[in-house]
């Protein structure tokens, strides 16, 4: 990504839900797009629901690594609101660890512009 960062330090469980910023067990390497476009909307849905209702949410984020790749291919995000049996929040989504215009080697983490040698 010319002049910009491709990779972010990604919280598996978003900061707005944990208040933790540097827990190594909650961090993976992800693309800027996965972090700010892919994951953030789901994290915010849960955070807003909790703030508005004070209800509990079962929430799990699982990074998916293929074979011995160093970089996750994405994360599975699952959420279920407890007190209302999922009528407030209920989703199970997969967010891909991609960046538009960039080709990523998930085994090594190396990247290049699509179409470049």
List the predicted regions and their residue ranges.
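Domain-level detector of nuclease and nuclease-like folds
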Residues: 1-117
């Amino acid at each position: 990504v010319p002049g910009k960062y491709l990779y972010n330090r990604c919280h598996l469980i978003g900061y707005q839900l944990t208040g933790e910023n540097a827990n190594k067990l909650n961090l993976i390497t992800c693309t800027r797009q996965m972090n700010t476009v892919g994951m953030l909307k789901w994290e915010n849905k849960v955070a807003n629901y909790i703030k508005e209702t004070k209800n509990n949410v079962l929430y799990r984020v699982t990074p998916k690594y293929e074979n011995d790749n160093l970089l996750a291919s994405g994360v599975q995000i699952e959420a279920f609101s407890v007190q209302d049996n999922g009528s407030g929040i209920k989703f199970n989504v997969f967010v891909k660890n991609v960046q538009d215009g960039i080709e990523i080697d998930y085994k090594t983490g190396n990247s290049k512009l699509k179409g470049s040698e």
